[in-house]
Amino acid sequence: MANVVVVGAQWGDEGKGKIVDWLSERADVIARFQGGHNAGHTLVIDGKVYKLNALPSGVVRGGKLSVIGNGVVLDPWHLIKEIDIIRGQGVDISPETLMIAENTPLILPIHGELDRAREEAASKGTKIGTTGRGIGPAYEDKVGRRSVRVADLADTATLEARVDRALQHHDPLRKGLGIEPVDRDALVAQLVEIAPHILKYAAPVWKVLNEKRRAGKRILFEGAQGALLDIDFGTYPFVTSSNVIAGQAATGVGVGPGAINYVLGIVKAYTTRVGEGPFPAELDDADGQRLGERGHEFGTVTGRKRRCGWFDAVLVRQTCATSGVNGIALTKLDVLDGFETLKICVGYELDGKRMDYLPTAADHQARCRPIYEEMPGWSDSTEGARSWADLPANAIKYVRRVEELIDCPVALLSTSPEREDTILVTDPFAD
């Protein structure tokens, strides 16, 4: 049976939640493999809106196993709150439908405090634009081998030792930032209190998933954010603190790379970005405002207004290469309805030279200027289209040109937030 990885191929907010939900109906397991609760998914099912940050999108589908892998950093208090909210919407969540990898690092209150203090202390031009939820510092502790992990919650003595090790690092850091030392006993008490609520979902996820694979079950690997926020291949330092590209799916849950049969890149028909960092095709004019208003471009987590621009084929071609994308799901095509002329970024001008990729150095990225190709728009609506025959001729030409420029075919086309408004070209789950 084919297993599918879903990754964002831009800066996040591409519409992954809808596509994952659309695919999850045919998957047996849905697994989150990286990120934290800094990335939000909005799902619309039968007119009901679900907003998820920490939970995999599969939880709203009955009879599926949802998994939070070791590549995720988990805020246990946020997770329990989110579970309660989703349960209140009539969704059943139990240890039979949700598993958390025992080796998943936890986000502690000290991580959020450090995250926010650093952003406040940063001078203009050095702010990353984080959500302030502690994801970056939690990953720092993971790499620094001082994380409190899910399994540590099962034994108080081990838990206290882990907390003490973390505070040896955090207290001097906090002193330098002018923050009070951590109340060690209060933190331990908080963790002891939350422990039973988390431990009932704890499992050796690597073992469970490998058994599911041998049994021929279909696994859908769900990424958060977007490949341009990848810690290695994104617009560093304006990136997230984890690997976002498809290769992380294997290490983020504990399966081999051979478990991945198809990589689906989610791509918006235009470009958006939240927070700081380079954005060559950004629009500060009426067209950019129109894209933002029509696309309802406000962050699910922060409510921050997203920066908007024309479709950047250079960036998407690059992320399709680094993630090994087999096909893309092109979303929000309907937002482009009514534009008389559309532009696609097909290259950059950097210090008088033409570039066909985004350079690595941050100062070079900041100086890249877009080279555009113009295409005629369309006046008819594409919203709700469910077949190619429903699309205006110029919309089809736009999609075909995108395919040519990014060297990757369109596998799915999304024309509204409703999961049924999807045109299937290639089935990612096909064996």
UniProtKB/Swiss-Prot annotation:
Signal peptide: none annotated. One of its GO terms (molecular function) is adenylosuccinate synthase activity. Plays an important role in the de novo pathway of purine nucleotide biosynthesis. Catalyzes the first committed step in the biosynthesis of AMP from IMP. Substrate binds at T300, V301, T302, G303, R304, K305, R306. This is Adenylosuccinate synthetase. It comes from Roseobacter denitrificans (strain ATCC 33942 / OCh 114) (Erythrobacter sp. (strain OCh 114)). Pfam families: Adenylsucc_synt. PANTHER family: ADENYLOSUCCINATE SYNTHETASE. Gene3D superfamilies: Adenylosuccinate Synthetase, subunit A, domain 1, Adenylosuccinate Synthetase, subunit A, domain 2, Adenylosuccinate Synthetase, subunit A, domain 3. IMP binds at D13, E14, G15, K16, N38, A39, G40, H41, T131, R145, Q225, T240, R304. GTP binds at residues 12-18, 40-42, 306, 332-334, 414-416. It is found in: Cytoplasm. Homodimer. GO terms for biological process: 'de novo' AMP biosynthetic process; IMP metabolic process.
